[in-house]
Amino acid sequence: MKLEKLVGDRFKERPADCQVDSHALMIRGGYMKNVANGIYSSYMPLKRITRKIEQIIREEMDAIDGQEVQFPVVMPASLWQESGRYDSIGKELLRFTDRNGAQMVLGMTHEEAAVQLVREYGQSYAKYPFMIYQIQTKFRDEARPRAGLIRVREF
């Protein structure tokens, strides 16, 4: 596809709000756009790069018998309460009540879900060893998003 057909504006000047060179280059090149503080839209060049990296990770993990899983974005708060991290993590963890009154969290990590999987699946020694991995977008209500894609809210 020709460059002029790609969605996303390209700039000659460095954006004033960019602190890191790589961040400035991606904005200038039309790879992404800042939608809100610490939240970016990825356009086709960056999506292609991301897909290629994910493909390499999948190939390498599959080669060593890794099993790709996908945990839910929204999890019951009880998983986080059981681990003790529900109260220890501050405002970065988004908490809400669903329409049925259940306490839920928007998972910024998925260790709790992984532990639940291992606890339920790994009841017998015969099932070990096994390896799981996931590639997924997460959200953390970062207090001070900065440095381009290094410290963002959605990652």
Located regions from the model:
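TRNA-recognition modules of translation machinery and tRNA-sensing kinases, especially anticodon-binding
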Residues: 1-155
